[in-house]
Every structure is written in C-alpha cells, then in structure tokens.
Design a protein with these regions (language model features):
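Short, conserved glycine- and acidic-residue-centered signature motifs
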Residues: 35-36, 73, 130
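Aromatic/hydrophobic pocket-lining residues that form π-stacking "cages" and hydrophobic walls in ligand
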Residues: 3, 43, 80, 104, ...
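Gly/Ser-rich helix-loop-strand patches that form or flank binding pockets
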Residues: 1-22, 108-146
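Short, flexible/disordered intra-domain loops and linkers
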Residues: 1, 63-71, 124
Length: 146
C-alpha cells in the first residue's frame, strides 16, 4: 500500500521481483486503457524487446451481475490483438469469470511478469485490485503509476 502511494505520488514504476526472470510470458488484464503508459502498451513494448509472449486475461463479472459487457470486452480484445500484430508479439487471450483480483492472482503461476496499474474502475476499487495482485501474485509484478 505504501509502495503504491509512493509510486503514484512520484510517477515511478515499481518492480516487485519474485525471482521469475527471464520474462518469457508477460500477463496483463484486458482493459479499455490504451494510453502510452498503460499496462497494455508497456507489456507489448517489453515483450517485443525481451522476445516474450503476452497473455491477456479478460475477466468478466458473472452474467447475472453484468449481462451487457461483451461488446466492450470484444472491442478491447480486438485492440489487444492488433497491438500484438503490430509489435510482432505472440498474444493469447484467456477468458475467465469472477473477481478480477483473485482470478488474475491465481493465474500468475503461469506467467513470469504481471503488469498492473490502478484500473479504470472507481479509484478505490482499482487501487484495491492492484494491491491484492501485488501481495498475492506468484510472478514478478511491474506496477505502473497513474
């Protein structure tokens, strides 16, 4: 929590290393943030530089909570696939359902580096998701400040 506050206040990315180098599989959450310093763009830049693959985890709420989510989600996954092609990086999209923080954290044993930031959801919820992943990830985590 303190590290996230420091990172955000000083605009410094932080790497939480968990001895998972070399980074051959980079994991990200599918989101609608495609800005220059977004986890999505940074993941593809790093993957291109390190000759790594990207795995994008597309986590949706259970259908009874949010039935009309698929069109936005499909647009985001299409944009991620376009980024993969333009960066000449292998990208796998994995679809899952449930709590974003818990599902992504449980997925980190299959990747070497997770790239996260506060999500575009409400500020406190996005921060809690990032904190949970930082504490529970089995891979190294690169936190990108907003």
């Amino acid at each position: 929590k303190t590290y996230i506050n420091f990172s955000n206040k000083n605009s410094i990315p932080l790497l939480f290393s968990r001895s998972s180098f070399p980074y051959k599989k980079i994991g990200i959450l599918v989101s609608d943030d495609f800005s220059d310093n977004s986890p999505v763009n940074i993941a593809f830049d790093l993957a291109s530089t390190l000759s790594a693959d990207v795995t994008a985890l597309n986590i949706s709420q259970p259908k009874f909570l949010q039935p009309e989510h698929t069109s936005t989600s499909n647009k985001n996954t299409e944009r991620i696939q376009d980024l993969a092609l333009s960066n000449e990086v292998q990208c796998e999209i994995v679809n899952a359902e449930g709590n974003e923080a818990k599902v992504f954290s449980s997925f980190t044993d299959k990747i070497d580096l997770s790239i996260v930031s506060q999500t575009s959801q409400s500020n406190w919820q996005g921060k809690k998701i990032a904190e949970f992943i930082l504490q529970n990830a089995k891979s190294s985590v690169l936190y990108i400040p907003n």
